[in-house]
Swiss-Prot record:
Sorted UniProt keywords: Ribonucleoprotein, Ribosomal protein, RNA-binding, rRNA-binding, tRNA-binding
Domain of life: Bacteria
S-adenosyl-L-methionine keyword on record: no
Cross-referenced NCBIfam families: rplP_bact (TIGR01164)
HAMAP family (alphabetical): Ribosomal_uL16
GO BP annotation list: translation
Subunit structure and binding partners: Part of the 50S ribosomal subunit.
Taxonomic source organism: Syntrophotalea carbinolica (strain DSM 2380 / NBRC 103641 / GraBd1) (Pelobacter carbinolicus)
Protein name from the UniProt record: Large ribosomal subunit protein uL16
């Protein structure tokens, strides 16, 4: 699972999800990408599950980049605990996703294989996504 090695503050506020992503919204590494259409939290388990689905479909070919990292901690209180007595202990890590953020990128496979791999990955994620193709690659085919 993805998680930070060291953090300054173990516990964070929940925060609000508003606005769209201006940074991290373009294809920077690969020719094909999976882009978020709506906001949400992606847990480290979901990120890994989608990555596995992609790598299993492309088998040995291609290169995959994960463009997001779970750097926000979620806390949880033990089961059957009364309210109060402070915030719970850190339980899991999530990545905060804004609309327009590029989640995964892929290169080195043909368009049909890449689109199918990204579609399989999209089914593992709890938000709406779309598949994007680099313009010069789209013009070739």
């Amino acid at each position: 699972m993805l998680m930070p090695k060291k953090v300054k503050h173990r516990k964070q506020f929940k925060g609000r999800m508003k606005g769209v992503a201006y940074r991290g919204s373009d294809l920077n590494f690969g020719d094909y990408g999976l882009k978020a259409v709506e906001c949400g939290w992606l847990s480290s388990r979901q990120i890994e599950s989608a990555r596995r689905a992609m790598t299993r479909h492309v088998k040995r070919g291609g290169k995959i980049w994960i463009r997001i990292f779970p750097d926000k901690s979620l806390t949880k209180k033990p089961a059957e605990t009364r309210m109060g007595k402070g915030k719970g202990s850190p339980d899991s890590w999530v990545a905060v996703i804004k609309p327009g953020m590029m989640l995964y990128e892929m290169q080195g496979v043909d368009k049909e294989v890449a689109c199918e791999a990204l579609r399989l990955a999209a089914h593992k994620l709890p938000m709406k996504t779309k598949i994007v193709v680099r313009e010069d690659v789209a013009n070739e085919s």
